[in-house]
């Protein structure tokens, strides 16, 4: 039975594509003074001037492919439901959600550019082949449910970078708009991610960087749409119908009048003729979590990185980045 699907359509789809500039630390490799060198590429702006001071920085263009798994709790409030053309009824006092858990497998393709020696800008496309939400209800009766859907979307962002005495830092912000199969309209997500790290080892052209950081996630609050009752519940069985009727029978007459259309449809032989309208608010249960990551610079063209998120929201990211100069230079 899928009663939880009436609610899970509003679960935040965190398409969590950590958009850290893959080579931000390279501009600020400590207090080592390198000799001035010739830089012909027109990008980044002011790149030639920076090169004249002996500061090394990455090739301006980059293409990256990332994969991420994320698991996090989500809070859902202000639940309203309606049947067909009936007015929406506030269910917040009747439906008590014990827990909502979101699991996401996501892929991200992005193109980035060092516009200035300290500023990276990028665009990205997101694909989530599997976003699973598990919901546990405690009232009006205990029930566990879950659903899986696909999500597509895209967005843009920017990363500011700085460094001092061998330590580098970045501050990244990005916005994505994601379209899920079971949600009306786009779900907007904003990620704010500061990081600080350093180069810990170098072997000729190969370098290893490690960092720590934090990520804040903000999602669009209100979610609404419609779903067929048959998709939400499946074919009602005797046990579920009994639970609904027992709950309905315990309501005072005024509240029974509000929910009578819904209960009548559940008790009918053809629940597929009814459509449930819904509206709810949602947010991530914890805005901030901690990040620990590392990047292996194979050469000036190829980079491999990995990052894990801990503390309530858990995540694992792996990525491959290829950098190149402006064509013709």
Feature map (PLM): residue ranges:
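Short glycine/proline- and aromatic-enriched beta-strand/turn motifs that initiate or cap beta-hairpins
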Residues: 26-103, 112, 123
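Extracellular loop and loop/strand-boundary signature of outer-membrane beta-barrel proteins
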Residues: 50, 92-97, 138-146, 178-185, ...
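Residues that define the transmembrane beta-barrel architecture of outer-membrane proteins
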Residues: 59, 103-107, 148-156, 177, ...
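Residues on the lipid-exposed face of transmembrane beta-strands in outer-membrane beta-barrel proteins
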Residues: 65, 104, 109-117, 123, ...
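Transmembrane beta-strands of outer-membrane beta-barrel pores
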Residues: 67-73, 125-131, 162-166, 173-181, ...
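Outer-membrane beta-barrel translocator domains and adjoining extracellular loop/strand segments
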Residues: 75-82, 132-140, 180-187, 222-229, ...
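Repeated loop/turn-to-beta-strand initiation elements of outer-membrane beta-barrel proteins
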Residues: 119-121, 164-169, 204-208, 300-304, ...
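Outer-membrane beta-barrel transmembrane domain signature
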Residues: 176-299
């Amino acid at each position: 039975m899928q009663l939880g699907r009436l609610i899970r359509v509003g679960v935040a789809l965190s398409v969590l594509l950590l958009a850290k500039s893959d080579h931000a630390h390279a501009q600020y490799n400590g207090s080592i003074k390198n000799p001035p060198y010739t830089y012909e590429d027109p990008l980044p702006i002011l790149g030639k001037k920076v090169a004249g001071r002996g500061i090394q920085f990455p090739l301006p263009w980059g293409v990256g492919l990332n994969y991420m798994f994320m698991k996090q709790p989500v809070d859902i409030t202000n639940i309203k439901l309606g049947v067909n053309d009936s007015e929406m009824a506030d269910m917040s006092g009747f439906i008590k959600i014990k827990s909502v858990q979101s699991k996401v497998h996501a892929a991200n393709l992005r193109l980035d550019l060092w516009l200035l020696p300290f500023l990276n800008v990028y665009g990205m496309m997101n694909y989530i082949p599997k976003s699973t939400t598990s919901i546990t209800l405690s009232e009006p009766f205990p029930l566990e449910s879950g659903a899986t859907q696909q999500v597509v979307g895209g967005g843009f962002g920017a990363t500011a970078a700085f460094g001092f005495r061998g330590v580098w830092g970045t501050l990244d912000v990005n916005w994505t708009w994601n379209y899920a199969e079971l949600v009306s309209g786009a779900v907007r997500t904003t990620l704010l991610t500061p990081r600080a790290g350093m180069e810990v080892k170098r072997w000729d052209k190969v370098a290893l960087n490690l960092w720590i950081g934090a990520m804040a996630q903000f999602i669009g609050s209100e979610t609404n749409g419609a779903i067929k009752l048959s998709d939400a519940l499946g074919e009602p069985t005797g046990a579920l119908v009994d639970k609904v009727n027992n709950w309905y029978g315990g309501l005072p007459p005024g509240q029974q009048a509000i929910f009578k259309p819904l209960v009548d449809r559940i008790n009918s032989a053809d629940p597929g003729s009814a459509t449930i309208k819904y509206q709810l608010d949602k947010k991530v249960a914890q805005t901030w979590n901690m990040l620990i990551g590392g990047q292996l610079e194979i050469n000036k063209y190829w980079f491999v990185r990995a990052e894990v998120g801990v503390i309530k929201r858990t995540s694992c990211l792996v990525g491959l980045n290829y950098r190149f100069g402006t064509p013709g230079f």
